[in-house]
Amino acid sequence: SALTKASKTADVIITTGGMSVGDADYLPRLFEQLGGESAAIKVAMKPGKPLTVGRLGAAIFLGLPGNPVSVFTTFALIGARTLRRRAGFSDSLPIRIQARVNFSLKRRPGRVEFRPATIIGYAGPTPVLSVAESGFSARISTLASASGFAVFPPGLIELAPGDTCDFIPFSPLAARY
C-alpha cells in the first residue's frame, strides 16, 4: 500500500479524511493493520476534528479532517508547527492581532473557533473583519476570499459590530499594523 511505502521513505505522512468512526473511514483500521501507533486528538477547536497523530514506522503521521477548511485550519495551526519542530526550527505561535468585527455573532461556547475572515477596511490601524457564515467548513471558496482567521475563544457567546476579536493573518503583510 502507499502507506507502507511512505512509512519506509518519508519523514512525515499526512492524510486528509477517512479518520473518523464511520463505515467509510477506513484509515484507522488500515493504520492499525500496518502496525502504526496513533491517537485521536480531541482538540477543542472548530473546525478541526477528527485529528489523529502518531507514528508509522519512522514517520510522523498526521491524519487531518476531510473538509477543505478543516484541513487548512488544522494544518495551518497544528500540522505546520509539527513540521517546523521536526525540521529543527523553533516552535512559534502564529501572529495574532486585534481586529474589529462588522457583524453580529451568537455561538455555543466550549471550543475555540477559527473562522475564515476578510479584512474589509481599517479603523485607524485596526483591521475591520467580515467572516464566513456558519457551515463554512466544506466550502473552500471561503478560504479564497479570506485574509486570515477570526478567533473566537471558548467562552465567547456573542459579538456585536464594533467588538474586537483576535485575528491571525494568513500573511504578515495582511496585518498592516
Regions found by a protein language model. Give the residues of each.
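N-terminal small/polar loop signature for handling phosphorylated ligands or for N-terminal nucleophile
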Residues: 1-33
